[in-house]
Structure formats: C-alpha cells, structure tokens
Amino acid sequence: MKIDKLVILSCFLFILTACGNEGTLSPSNIKENYYAADSTATDLESQLKCAFYKRDSSYLLFNDTLRYEPLGKDTNGDMLYYTETVDIGYVMTSNTMPSKYIYQYLTTMNEKQGAVDFIEANLLPHLSVKLRPFSWLLINHIAKYITDDGVSYSYDSDKSYAVGDRCTALAMGGLSNLSDSARAAFTQSVLTGILQNKVSKQTSETLQSFVKYGSALYGTSSSESPATEDENMVLMKTSGFISPYYWGDYPYLGLYPSKDQDLASFVELVLTQTADEVESAYADYPIVIKKYNAMKKIIINLGYIY
C-alpha cells in the first residue's frame, strides 16, 4: 500500500513538473478568421480593411475568395487546392429557386475607397452596430444564376445587391455616375434588403406583435374569388395585407401571402413611407396601419436608425 501511494505521488509530481515546463497552454483548435485582413500588412487595401473594421465593426471584402490553400499533389503530380468562398446563398422557401451569384471585382484603389466612402456616408448611419452585416463584399457587378435541377445554372438577372447571413454584397460599379435620385434609390433598396433578411430571422416572440394579425391566414385561400388583381388587392388589404401571394413573379388571386412575404412587404413599407403617408393611403384598412406601426417598432428595436 505504501509503495502504491509513493508511485501515485511520484506520477503527480512528474505531471506538475511537466506542465510547469510547458508554460502557458493555448488551445490548438482556434479557427482562423478568414474575413479579417492581416493587421501587420502594409499594402493600401489591407490598411483600408483594418481601418474600416476598427471604425465600423464589420469586415470588408473586395473578393469572394476567403482562402486558397495548397493541399498537396494528386496521383498525376498536379497540385490540389482548397478554396473557401463567401457563401451568399439565396433564402430557400417554397417559392424560390436555388441560386448562386457570380461577381466582377473592383480593380483600383480609387474604386474601392469610393465604395467604402459611399456605404459609410449612406448606409451605416442607418444601421446600429448590432444590425450591420458581419461583412461587406464590395464588387463591381453581381449576376444571379438559378437552377431547376440543382446541377446546371442559367443566367437570371443582374442584381444591385445580395444579402446573406454572413455577408452583404453590393454592386458598386458605375455608382459615381448615378444621379442623386438613383443613388438614393440604391441606398433604400439595400437597407430594405438588409432589414428584410434580419427580420425574417427573428423569433416568434419578437414578431408576435406583427404576425398576430395575419398568422391564421398565411398561405391559405380566401372564400372569395376575385376576378382581377385590383379586386384581389382590395381583398388582401381588407385582411391587413399589402401584397398577394407570389410564386416567383406571379401573383395568385384569392391566396393570402406567406409569412415571409408579409414580413418583407411591411419592412419595405416602413422604410419607404412615413406614418402620415400610410395613414392616408390605407385609411380604409385599419389592420394595415396597425401592422405598419408594429413593424416600425420591431425594426427600431433591432437597431434601425431613421
């Protein structure tokens, strides 16, 4: 028994000595942040990215490739690489197609600095830190491609922006040539997209003050059968909706919108019209006005700044 105790004590002292000689231990599995610029880099782009993060609490990207690392060689002796890119996936619902985005990049520092100046002057003043995207991808052009079979993609449309959970991409090409009204419209559309994405991710409790007016009707058919789109919109507004149900770009008559469609339409209404304008335009539809006020409170609580 005494021998056993001595062996245990000796092992314990050995472990203490070994740990003491190793110094402070650090976790070996810390994941590298590939969104962040190298803080020791001296090139102008890296300095711009670091300064932006310090000021604005979001990462800044000019390329959707986060890392491109060699893995080794294949059996033919050719190099293999691991590529990680920014994934701005299109939000998948029952009425959207899987899609991807193809980007063209800004090529000069003047373009990149101009893009940063634009978002700092026009977008960030409306977004508190908690509402800002994790990262901004500022590029020249965005093209959206969709697929029917999940394998082959076909061109769908050019986009001025794309909003994802980890990144918001903005097409900044030609921005300096836009009129003041066009620049304002671009700003408004981006803010609307960011808020629509943010609101769609909120809990039922956060959205309860809004969805309580329409949750029983989402995605259901009306007992009435409107013959025209105008008749359909009267039916929608009477029930508190400002948008019909859409499949792609096509409205369905007599079918109430989904929850996501209802949220998105009212976020846009709140960001584009004042309370006085809404009360005038929807004077005959009191539920619409109540939902407008409820949504306005929600986005203010999320950090939107008027």
Regions found by a protein language model. Name each.
Residues 216-306:
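Metalloprotease/metallohydrolase-associated module, dominated by Zn2+-dependent proteases
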Residues 19-116, 126, 281-306:
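Acidic/polar, low-complexity intrinsically disordered N-terminal segments immediately downstream
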Residues 1-22:
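Sec-dependent bacterial lipoprotein signal peptides
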Residues 7, 96, 100, 175-180, ...:
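Generic alpha-helix detector with strongest preference for long hydrophobic helices that associate
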Residues 2-8, 31, 49, 54, ...:
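Context-gated lysine
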Residues 77, 150, 230-233:
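Intrinsic-disorder/low-complexity loop/linker signature
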Residues 102-225:
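Acidic/His-rich structured neighborhood in mature extracellular/periplasmic domains
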